[in-house]
Design a protein with these regions (language model features):
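Extracytoplasmic/peripheral linker and loop segments enriched in polar/acidic and small residues
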Residues: 15, 419-432, 460-526, 549
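Gly/Pro-rich hinge or "lid" segments in bacterial periplasmic/extracellular proteins
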Residues: 174-244, 248, 258
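Structural transition elements
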Residues: 338-380, 401-403
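Ligand/substrate-recognition segments at binding pockets and active sites
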Residues: 225-227, 369-450, 521
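Surface-exposed binding/hinge segments that line
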Residues: 137-196
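N-terminal lobe/hinge region of extracytoplasmic solute-binding protein
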Residues: 46-95, 213
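Ligand-site clamp/hinge motif
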Residues: 236-280
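Long beta-strand-rich cores associated with HINT superfamily self-processing modules
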Residues: 523-549
Length: 549
């Protein structure tokens, strides 16, 4: 009997020892696994504050970049700016190429659990073209039936050529065939909106993290509407969440490159843009990644506010007084190149000859450096306006690089045009955009990056009725060329190209704006950060497939 008891006790002890050993082994294995699996968290910088998370009202690259990562549309761009299906699962185009029937995936949801439906697109697009919304990107809808008439207040929003032909099917009616329409469908302004949430918050929708709903890979948290730091968290409701590896992205607005570099060196930033003096110093850094970018920096004149700026000779004098080569070599130093015109080199080529658009559209003696001629033309323009000198203020964003560019322009223009008294005002980017939209400026230093790979994305900006044209510049020949490209020549590839080249030449000859340089993108990227997709057309970064290795 005692032997039996001893045997049972021994067996029990052995079982306990085995269990304890198993627990210890499991813990060690788990610890080793945890130690070998890096935390899927990255730290990034932003050059400016978020202006809005409302897709119908955004007008700046940083806010668009944020929306690209928290929302999703029918298509998404790859690194070359080519659209691929996202929420769309099937696209059927009619024989005359004017009707698009698009099936939408059934498993897409908003971050509040609501399903993403065809009606969400209908509501979003109707809201965007409604003149009450005052969306800055209404031109993207111009190919859709009745869009322009609705935006001009001539028709009701219900007449827009988009309908839900089922819970998960969208039917789009175009005015005419448009070869680049799929690229337009990938733009953020054409993403869907959850009507219930937008109606709940009204005008406050998109003004903070908590007053926005998301359907993309991440959700925005911690943005109050005015602060300079926020987070992107993995969206548990995202339909394709299995491809999303990052759990958290920490963003911080950093306007001084030196501050960003210090943080990068100490491991507190995983990716940072390189500009100015840093570009030269870090040229051989093994973390440096160089990328082309379809973006142009330019001076915009407010001819409605300052009458003298409506004088062509004054504008041409200002343009010829700027040494663009010196600007990119001594201030930017990041591979940016002087711009002869608005449409950047390397984006579009003549369908017949293969010649680059920028080269074909260049106009002599409009963007070269000629201080002697600049002085003569400026003086001539002043005389025509009955003035002895001109005093204006250049409005610019207050990040370090933009301030340096503004100061350079002030220096070179003051030197070459003694009759020009130019002062500089630098303010937060979001405030600057608001002032420009409300025409509260004399001169403005601003940039535009392509919405898609076609010259029209730049040239459409300066038609007389464009919502982006706050300058007051208007030219009938320019308007006609753009109109022809969008209508009578829309299906004739070469004729359309010729229309756009003509428009670009008119803009350059008249100096409706003064282009400065084509931007280039350079970043320091930590070797452990993989899978970031950079779109060289619009300059956006997608973290959907990014991960820490």
């Amino acid at each position: 009997m005692e032997n039996g008891k001893k045997k049972k006790i021994l067996i029990a002890l052995i079982v306990i020892v085995i269990l304890i050993a198993g627990v210890i082994f499991w813990k060690r294995k788990n610890q080793q696994k945890t130690a070998s699996t890096p935390a899927q968290t990255i730290n990034l910088s932003a050059s400016s504050e978020i202006s809005s998370l409302d897709i119908s009202k955004i007008d700046d690259r940083n806010s668009f970049n944020q929306v690209d990562n928290v929302d999703e549309g029918l298509f998404r761009y790859d690194k070359n700016g080519v659209p691929h299906k996202a929420l769309a699962t099937k696209v059927k185009i009619s024989k005359d190429q004017t009707v698009y029937t698009i099936d939408i995936r059934h498993d897409a949801k908003w971050s509040n659990g609501d399903p993403v439906t065809a009606e969400d697109f209908v509501y979003s697009w109707q809201r965007a073209v409604d003149p009450k919304t005052a969306s800055p990107y209404t031109y993207l809808f111009s190919d859709i039936k009745n869009a322009d008439e609705i935006n001009q207040g001539k028709k009701a929003v219900s007449q827009l050529g988009v309908k839900a032909s089922g819970k998960y099917q969208l039917k789009i009616q175009l005015n005419k065939p448009q070869s680049y329409f799929k690229m337009v469908l990938a733009r953020e302004t054409l993403y869907p909106l959850d009507k219930k949430v937008v109606k709940k918050y009204g005008k406050a929708y998109g003004t903070s993290s908590k007053k926005t709903v998301y359907n993309g890979p991440f959700i925005n948290t911690g943005w109050t509407g005015t602060n300079d730091s926020w987070k992107l968290k993995k969206n548990p409701y995202y339909w394709d969440k299995k491809v999303v590896k990052l759990q958290t992205i920490n963003f911080q607005v950093i306007k001084q490159p030196s501050t960003a570099y210090n943080l990068y060196q100490t491991g507190k930033l995983d990716l940072m843009p390189v500009v100015g003096e840093q570009a030269k110093q870090l040229e051989n850094n093994q973390d440096l990644v160089k990328r082309p970018l379809a973006a142009t920096e330019y001076l915009q004149y407010n001819m409605s506010k300052v009458k003298a700026l409506g004088n062509k000779n004054i504008r041409l004098g200002i343009s010829l007084a700027i040494n663009r080569s010196q600007l990119v070599k001594t201030i930017l130093k990041n591979g940016s190149t002087p711009a002869d015109g608005l449409v950047p080199a390397g984006m579009s080529k003549n369908p017949k000859t293969g010649e680059d658009f920028a080269k074909e559209a260049a106009v002599k003696n409009t963007a070269n450096y000629d201080p002697k001629l600049a002085k003569q033309l400026f003086a001539k323009g002043l005389k025509e306006e009955g003035l002895k000198n001109l005093q204006v203020t250049l409005l610019a964003a207050n990040d370090d690089t933009t301030k340096q560019i503004a100061e350079y322009l002030q220096s070179v223009l003051s030197k070459n045009l003694p009759q020009l008294k130019l002062s500089v005002s630098t303010i937060p980017f979001t405030v600057m955009i608001s002032d420009v939209d409300n025409k509260k400026y004399d001169l403005n230093l601003i940039s535009w990056s392509a919405d898609f790979a076609d010259p029209i994305t730049f040239l459409q900006l300066f038609t007389s009725n464009s919502s982006e044209n706050s300058s007051g510049w208007s030219n009938a020949e320019y308007d006609q060329a753009i109109n022809d490209s969008n209508n009578k020549d829309a299906n004739n590839q070469q004729a359309r190209w010729n229309d756009l080249v003509k428009a670009a030449k008119v803009l350059a000859s008249d100096q409706g704006i003064t282009t400065l340089y084509k931007s280039n993108s350079e970043d320091l990227v930590k070797p452990h950060l993989k899978g970031v997709v950079f779109n060289g057309i619009n300059g956006h970064y997608s973290y959907r497939t990014a991960y820490v290795k």
